[in-house]
């Protein structure tokens, strides 16, 4: 034998001891109490937020009501108070909006906390499901162990059957060939009685064993039912989890806000979140109860299995003791006499009948075992199907990625916000364009009206100049007339008899002059009437222009409202279009996901086919093994029967030969002895007859035995041929099945590669489309920035144009007021002029009357000069003439004063116009300064924001640089660690290659030395072959490990490249921010220069204006006061005119009375007709002047009505201006809200881009994991091929062994003995390794007492390496732990190498069964077993008792209770680390 230092495979399965359900329930309960507290705090925060929302809504409603009331009463209040109140309300709105934004932030934080709770909830559910699955697997393992024990009981029964056949053979052989010494009859009877008692005892023991086997069957059925119930409960819990997930998904899909209703959406979100939390916590509690119940049932089942194992162990010990006792009794060697052949044959017959009964029972038991094996295979298949369904559901739930849905929702929201902003921008653009157009029209109209007004003012000035010239002429003529009258009076006084002709000529000249003057006055009046009509027309045009302006403003407001209404429809249209686009993208994504799922399903179907093929192969192997065992048992039975027959036939032949010799001797004696007596002849003849009958009987029996032997041999040959045929058929079916599976694997692999390529192309297309969308979003953001700048400039222009419009309207109002005041003054002056003219006419008439009377008196009588001087009437007339002259002088003086006042008014108007122009310039400059200050503030705010973002970016850059440095260091350390691991694995691979060479040489040497392999030689060759196969597998696993490490290196390199790409992106962002800051600083410098220029211009204007600017702040109030004073003066003039009209009416009445008196007095005279005609003319002129006065009164009333209309229109314009101011403030607030929405939208876009990058990273990581899983699956296929090759080698070995089985009887009996002894040893080793009894655990503990601390360290290392597989930080931790535990691993290697031993030889039949059944176990635990054999990792799956022995007592404190100690023990165990995470989270 070769003594080689090697590691031996430890095939023992160490059962894991779980903590009690009470402890887990305690930890879960504490976790959920914490979660309930958090939920209560969240609900209280939500209630507080709801109260705040209600308060905010109430404030908003109050604010809106106040705003409406102010709009209705705004026309009566002053502009200053309304603007201050609007500012206060704008500040209130801004504060409310800030509060709303804070509430939004708190709501987002609450949503994030709720998602975190849901994630922790899903993690705990997964971990508890894992515990449940572990319990289920432990129950299944115990069930498999019971099945193995059941098979071991059947093997023991077969062994007992073989022992009984041996007893029968020994009894049958020992009968005639006993010692020649005869025993007494009593001894023989006692011996027979003893043997029958022994056989009865054996039968009783066998019946007891069968009863125990039936009990085991019933217990196995109960275990199967428990497994079915556990599977049903697991399916129920999975369905409940699916329902919870579907509810959660349905709740997630219902979270859409409609039409931007922020308050209602927020409340709905909060209510939905609260209800969802309640539902989730209720579902969580219900699942807790279900999982607790399942865990309790699992614990009960585990206890039952432990009890059953203990009972089976007891039964096994009792059976072993009974067998030992019986073999001791049998091996004592009982003897009996030759005389009692009949009794011996009776005992043998009883034994044969018992043996046949036992054989029938064994056949029934084997059939039952096969039936049970079929049930077990079906149950295993169902379990695999359930696992496959669970994996499919898990994959489907993982494929339904929530991140993609969130990304789509965020994209929809951002696009909707962007469309809304575009619509608002378009709306503001249209409004601005409409206002610009309207302003241009108004400016054109105003220019035209100004030109016309200037023309008419020039006409009025020209007419006023003509009136002045005419007045001067009239005054000159009146002076000349007065001079002539004076001369005439002097002449009349000096000359007593003037000539009547001279007076008449003079009178005619005066009349002609008066007519010319009257004609000139008529022309002037007609021209004045035309000018008044033009002025009225101009006023009417101004009124129409005001109405047009009002209509235009109303139209603009209506257009704005209509545009707002139409914008909703446009928004809906854009929404629908974007939804259609998103639906198309969604459909494309769904198609790709469906293709991916289809390929996954195909791959799963392939794996299911592989697993089903593997189960079929295992079932075929089991069936082959069972059939081979059955055939070998039948062959051994047949060989035993043949040997029994031969052992019976040989003494019969010897007896027949003895009888023939005795017969011949007797015949010889008969022939020789003829002289004997009749007695002897009769006795000899009777003896001859008896001998002859006995010989015949023996010959018949011999022939019968030969026929039975021939039949048994034929049956044996049939069995051998049947066994060969079944093996060949199974080989052919397996080969065909393997070929079809290989073809299916090849086709599916090709399909999977094609699907993967198409999916990769589609994914690349989707990534390109998403990049395009991101570029479009960036372009839209840039366009939005440009639009914001344009909107700001347009708003500034709008404000400037509004200010200019206001100033122009004020100018127009002032000019209208001045025109009205001038018109009233002109009308008053003209009324005065008309009055004076009428007085002059009356005076002229009276003068003519007096002259006529004088002439009459002169012609009638020629009194003396004294009488003429003393006439009373003459004196009276002289007095009236004097009074009239005084009045004429007064009138002239008043006309001069009025003309002087008018010139002063014109100067004052010119001065006011100059002041208005200066005020307009100053106000425009002030507005420009205010706008530039606003722009500076805006740009300074932008600069501040950009600086703050630059600080953040610099911090991020520093952090990223630090992370990159640490990441580079970590990557270097990881690469060094990988290099070390690869080097170590390369050394191990080299060692394994050397070991493989040594093993192949040893196997060849053993086979060459042991050509005729028998017994131990076969076992050693099988052992070395198995060891060679395991070492080859270990070497392949090491190669695979190297590939995994290289793939991890590739993954880390890809992550490093991604980090570098993010660094480049951050640098680009930083440079863009720096450029934006530079541009902002340049714009601010330009604006400051503009402000300084405006201030210098303002100072220059103030210096130019001098002292007049002191009146500028009070200009508005003073203008209003002047306007009111002028209005009061006009009203006073109207009153004076009315009083004058009443006075003129009284004068008219006096004149009428005078006329009556004159008519009564001058009735006798000759020229009455002439006087009456003169008087009639005077009356017509008086009526004419009266009509003119009435027309003037009507015109004055019209002018007053027009003044009232202008005042009303002015008030309306002021109200409209206030409404425009309110609209402007609303537009400004809307712009501010739009800016806030834009910033929030940019933040959402940034968040969305971050989420998108995270989703891309997750997608790439999942794709890498998928590729790794595919590599693992290909490796599994390779292992399947290796297993098939091993199966073929085993089959060839089986055929070779079958050929060697047909040897000699001694070799067969020796082989049978070696099989029995090997079965006993193997059953003892398998039962000791597979059972979970306290004996095996204590034995393993005794073997591993020396290395508990090292096992604990290695357990930590393995746990960390399992839990942290793909992150660089965790690899760094694993490196540190590996460095810390190098000493322990080297120690473990030394200890494991010093403990290598050689296993005892395994019998061939058991070796065949072991090699056929333990392939799956080797395939499942190959990786773990490799690590155990290599010494890298030791067995980490300790029980909780062993872990409590290694528990660190320093973690405990003095104040800890028993519950705290138990919780700390459980949470410090790496197996229950997830409970620690959920407890802390």
From Swiss-Prot:
User: What range does the record give for the signal peptide?
Assistant: none
Tell me yes or no: is Repeat among this UniProt entry's keywords.
yes
Reply yes or no: does the keyword Transit peptide apply. Answer: no
List compositional bias (Low complexity) regions by residue number: 73-84, 1323-1336, 1393-1403
Record localization: Virion
User: Got a GO cellular component term for this one?
Assistant: virion component
Record keywords, A-Z = Repeat, Virion
Residues covered by region (Disordered):
65-88, 1319-1403
PANTHER family in alphabetical order: CENTROSOMAL PROTEIN 2, CENTROSOME-ASSOCIATED PROTEIN CEP250 ISOFORM X1
Q: What is this protein called?
A: Structural protein ORF147
- Protein source organism: Trichoplusia ni ascovirus 2c (TnAV-2c)
Taxonomic path: Viruses, Varidnaviria, Bamfordvirae, Nucleocytoviricota, Megaviricetes
């Amino acid at each position: 034998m070769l003594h080689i230092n090697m590691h031996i495979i430890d095939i023992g399965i160490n059962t894991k001891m779980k903590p009690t359900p009470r402890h887990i329930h305690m930890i879960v309960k504490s976790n959920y109490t914490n979660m309930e507290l958090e939920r209560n705090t969240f609900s209280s925060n939500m209630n507080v937020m709801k109260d705040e929302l209600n308060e905010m809504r109430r404030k908003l409603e109050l604010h809106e009501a106040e705003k409406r009331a102010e709009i209705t009463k705004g026309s009566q209040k002053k502009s200053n108070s309304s603007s201050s109140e609007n500012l206060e309300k704008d500040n209130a709105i801004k504060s409310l909006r800030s509060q709303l934004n804070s509430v939004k932030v708190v709501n987002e934080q609450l949503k994030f906390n709720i998602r975190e709770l849901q994630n922790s909830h899903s993690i705990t559910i997964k971990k508890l499901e894992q515990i449940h699955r572990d319990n289920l697997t432990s129950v299944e393992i115990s069930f498999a162990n019971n099945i193995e024990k059941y098979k071991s009981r059947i093997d023991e029964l077969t062994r007992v059957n073989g022992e009984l056949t041996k007893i029968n053979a020994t009894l049958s052989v020992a009968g005639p060939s006993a010692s020649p010494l005869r025993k007494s009859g009593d001894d023989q009877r006692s011996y027979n009685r003893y043997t029958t008692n022994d056989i009865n005892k054996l039968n009783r023991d066998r019946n007891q064993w069968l009863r125990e086997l039936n009990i085991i069957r019933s217990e196995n059925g109960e275990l199967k039912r428990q497994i079915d119930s556990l599977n049903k409960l697991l399916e129920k819990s999975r369905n409940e989890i699916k329902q919870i997930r579907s509810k959660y998904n349905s709740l997630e899909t219902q979270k859409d806000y409609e039409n931007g209703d922020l308050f209602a959406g927020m409340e709905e979100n909060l209510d939905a979140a609260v209800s969802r939390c309640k539902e989730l916590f209720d579902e969580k509690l219900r699942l807790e109860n279900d999982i607790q119940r399942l865990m309790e049932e699992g614990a009960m089942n585990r206890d039952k299995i432990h009890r059953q194992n203990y009972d089976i162990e007891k039964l096994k010990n009792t059976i072993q003791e009974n067998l030992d006792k019986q073999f001791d009794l049998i091996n004592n060697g009982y003897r009996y006499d030759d005389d009692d052949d009949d009794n011996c044959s009776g005992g043998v017959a009883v034994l044969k009948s018992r043996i046949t009964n036992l054989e029938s029972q064994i056949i029934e038991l084997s059939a039952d075992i096969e039936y049970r094996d079929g049930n077990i295979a079906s149950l295993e298949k169902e379990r695999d199907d359930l696992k496959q369904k669970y994996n499919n559901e898990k994959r489907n739930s993982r494929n339904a990625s929530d991140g993609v849905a969130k990304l789509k929702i965020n994209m929809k929201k951002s696009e909707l916000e962007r469309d809304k902003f575009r619509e608002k921008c378009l709306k503001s653009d249209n409004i601005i364009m409409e206002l610009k157009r309207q302003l241009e029209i108004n400016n054109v109209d105003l220019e035209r009206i100004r030109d016309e007004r200037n023309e008419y003012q020039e006409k009025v000035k020209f007419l006023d100049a003509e009136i002045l010239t005419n007045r001067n002429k009239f005054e000159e003529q009146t002076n000349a007339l007065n001079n002539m009258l004076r001369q005439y009076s002097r002449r009349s006084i000096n000359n007593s008899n003037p000539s009547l002709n001279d007076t008449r000529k003079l009178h005619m000249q005066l009349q002609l002059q008066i007519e010319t003057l009257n004609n000139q006055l008529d022309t002037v009046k007609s021209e004045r009437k035309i000018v008044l009509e033009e002025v009225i027309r101009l006023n009417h045009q101004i009124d129409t222009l005001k109405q047009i302006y009002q209509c235009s403003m109303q139209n603009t407001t209506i257009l704005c409202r209509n545009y707002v209404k139409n914008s909703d429809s446009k928004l809906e249209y854009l929404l629908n279009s974007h939804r259609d686009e998103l639906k198309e993208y969604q459909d494309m994504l769904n198609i790709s996901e469906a293709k991916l799922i289809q390929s996954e399903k195909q791959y799963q179907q392939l794996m299911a086919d592989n697993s089903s093929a593997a189960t079929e192969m295992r079932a075929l192997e089991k069936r082959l093994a069972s059939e081979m065992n059955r055939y070998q048992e039948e062959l051994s039975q047949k060989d035993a029967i043949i040997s029994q027959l031969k052992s019976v036939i040989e003494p019969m032949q010897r007896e027949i030969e003895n009888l023939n010799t005795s017969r011949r001797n007797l015949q010889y004696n008969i022939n020789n002895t003829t002289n004997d007596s009749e007695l002897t002849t009769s006795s000899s003849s009777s003896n001859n007859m008896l001998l002859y009958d006995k010989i015949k009987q023996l010959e018949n029996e011999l022939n019968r035995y030969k026929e039975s032997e021939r039949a048994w041999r034929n049956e044996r040959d049939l069995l051998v041929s049947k066994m060969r045929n079944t093996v060949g058929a199974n080989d052919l079916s397996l080969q065909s099945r393997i070929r079809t599976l290989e073809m299916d694997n090849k086709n599916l692999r090709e399909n999977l590669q094609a699907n993967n390529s198409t999916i990769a192309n589609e994914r690349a297309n989707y990534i390109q489309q998403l990049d395009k969308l991101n570029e479009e979003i960036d372009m839209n953001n840039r366009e939005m920035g440009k639009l914001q700048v344009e909107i700001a400039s347009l708003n500034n222009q709008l404000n400037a144009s509004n200010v200019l419009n206001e100033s122009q309207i004020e100018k127009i109002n002032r000019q209208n007021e001045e025109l009205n005041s001038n018109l009233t003054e002109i009308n008053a002056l003209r009324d005065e002029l008309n009055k004076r003219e009428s007085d002059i006419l009356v005076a002229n008439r009276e003068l003519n009357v007096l002259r006529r009377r004088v002439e009459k008196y002169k012609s009638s009588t020629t009194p003396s000069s004294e009488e003429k001087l003393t006439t009373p009437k003459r004196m009276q007339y002289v007095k009236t003439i004097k009074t009239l002259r005084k009045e004429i002088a007064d009138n002239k003086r008043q006309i001069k004063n009025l003309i002087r006042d008018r010139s002063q008014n014109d100067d004052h108007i010119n001065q006011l116009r100059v002041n208005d122009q200066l005020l307009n310039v100053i106000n425009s400059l002030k507005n420009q300064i205010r706008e530039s200050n606003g722009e500076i503030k805006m740009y300074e705010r932008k600069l501040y924001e950009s600086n703050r973002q630059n600080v953040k970016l610099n911090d991020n850059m520093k952090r990223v640089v630090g992370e990159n440095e640490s990441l580079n260091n970590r990557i270097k350390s990881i690469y060094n660690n990988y290099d070390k691991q690869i080097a170590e694995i390369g050394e191990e691979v080299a060692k394994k290659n050397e070991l493989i060479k040594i093993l192949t040489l040893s196997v060849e040497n053993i086979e060459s030395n042991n050509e005729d392999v028998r017994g131990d030689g076969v076992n050693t060759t099988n052992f070395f072959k198995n060891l060679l196969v395991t070492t080859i597998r270990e070497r392949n696993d090491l190669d695979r490990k190297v590939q995994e490490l290289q793939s991890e290196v590739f993954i880390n390199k890809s992550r490093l490249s991604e980090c570098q790409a993010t660094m480049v992106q951050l640098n680009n962002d930083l440079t863009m921010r720096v450029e934006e800051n530079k541009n902002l600083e340049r714009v601010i410098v330009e604006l400051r220069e503009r402000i300084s220029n405006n201030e210098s211009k303002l100072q220059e204007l103030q210096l130019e204006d001098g002292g007049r600017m002191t009146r500028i702040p009070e200009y508005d109030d003073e203008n209003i006061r002047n306007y009111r004073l002028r209005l009061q003066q006009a009203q006073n003039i109207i009153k004076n005119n009315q009083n004058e009209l009443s006075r003129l009416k009284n004068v008219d009445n006096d004149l009428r009375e005078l006329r009556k008196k004159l008519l009564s007095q001058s009735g006798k005279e000759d020229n009455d007709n002439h006087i009456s005609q003169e008087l009639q003319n005077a009356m017509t002129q008086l009526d004419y002047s009266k009509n003119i006065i009435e027309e003037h009164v009507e015109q004055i009333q019209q002018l007053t009505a027009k003044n009232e209309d202008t005042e009303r229109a002015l008030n309306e314009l002021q109200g409209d201006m206030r409404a425009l101011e309110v609209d402007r403030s609303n537009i400004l607030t809307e712009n501010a809200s739009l800016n806030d929405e834009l910033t929030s939208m940019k933040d959402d876009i940034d968040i969305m881009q971050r989420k998108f990058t995270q989703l891309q990273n997750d997608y790439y990581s999942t794709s890498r994991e998928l590729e790794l899983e595919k590599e693992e699956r290909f490796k599994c296929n390779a292992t399947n091929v290796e297993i098939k090759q091993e199966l073929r080698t085993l089959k060839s070995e089986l055929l070779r062994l079958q050929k060697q089985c047909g040897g000699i009887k001694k070799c067969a009996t020796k082989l049978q003995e070696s099989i029995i002894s090997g079965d006993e040893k193997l059953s003892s080793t398998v039962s000791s390794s597979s059972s979970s009894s306290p004996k095996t655990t204590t034995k393993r503990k005794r073997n591993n007492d020396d290395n508990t601390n090292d096992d604990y360290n290695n357990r930590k290392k393995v746990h960390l390496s399992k839990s942290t597989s793909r992150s660089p930080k965790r690899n760094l931790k694993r490196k540190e732990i590996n460095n810390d535990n190098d000493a322990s691993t080297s120690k473990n290697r030394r200890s494991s190498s010093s403990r290598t031993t050689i296993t005892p030889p395994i019998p061939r039949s058991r070796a065949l069964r072991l090699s056929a059944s333990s392939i799956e176990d080797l395939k499942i635990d190959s990786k773990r077993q490799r690590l155990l054999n290599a010494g890298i990792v030791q067995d980490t799956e300790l029980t909780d008792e062993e872990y409590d022995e290694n528990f660190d007592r320093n973690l405990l404190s003095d104040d800890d209770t028993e519950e705290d100690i138990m919780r700390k023990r459980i949470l410090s165990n790496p197996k229950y680390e997830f409970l620690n995470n959920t407890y802390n989270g």
